[in-house]
Amino acid sequence: NDISFEVEKGSIFSIVGPSGSGKTTLLGLCAGLDSPSAGNIELCGSNLNDLDEDERALLRNKEVGFIFQNFQLLPTLTALENVIVPLELQGEKNASKVGKELLEKVGLADRMHHYPSQLSGGEQQRVALARAFSNKPTILFADEPTGNLDEETGEKVIQLLFQLNKEAGTTLVIITHDLELANRTQQILRLKGGKIVSNEKTLAV
């Protein structure tokens, strides 16, 4: 309902609100997964209203990364194969080498040939992190990235997410109900009932 905001390039931005406030719906719209009933959405310099579904898919494949609460790993593929898939779709000739380097970076050098069912929740989310950064996205959307993890594991995943993001210079948008996590981002957009309650910068660097 009359939602308007901008996310600065290279910043870490959070969208918070109670269940049913519209957080995930808003993420879907911003990422071009859904179409708005009114208004315009610009993503990485492209007006999504001007693109058809195939063109939006190409834009996402090239510019956008995703991290989901339930990991969204392909169960019949190993950790390495899950990371390699988007690289191969982009025609990366050294997909296997890049995938191995990413899994080493997230601390899974000894688990890359394991299947998701053989990995803990924290390990699965680290595979998801490696996959999300594999195509060097301009912007990364993380939907409740620690929602299925215990507090200690969730903290390790967030530290890793922030570290990888800093190295890559990616714009990061986090959907969360965790205000403590939101306060570590540079800007917080608060939603309630599908409307913006506040949009404030924080002291986080």
Predicted regions and their residues:
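ABC family nucleotide-binding domain
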Residues: 1-191
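H-loop (His-switch) and adjacent beta-strand-loop-beta switch element
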Residues: 188-201
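ABC ATPase nucleotide-binding domains
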Residues: 203-205
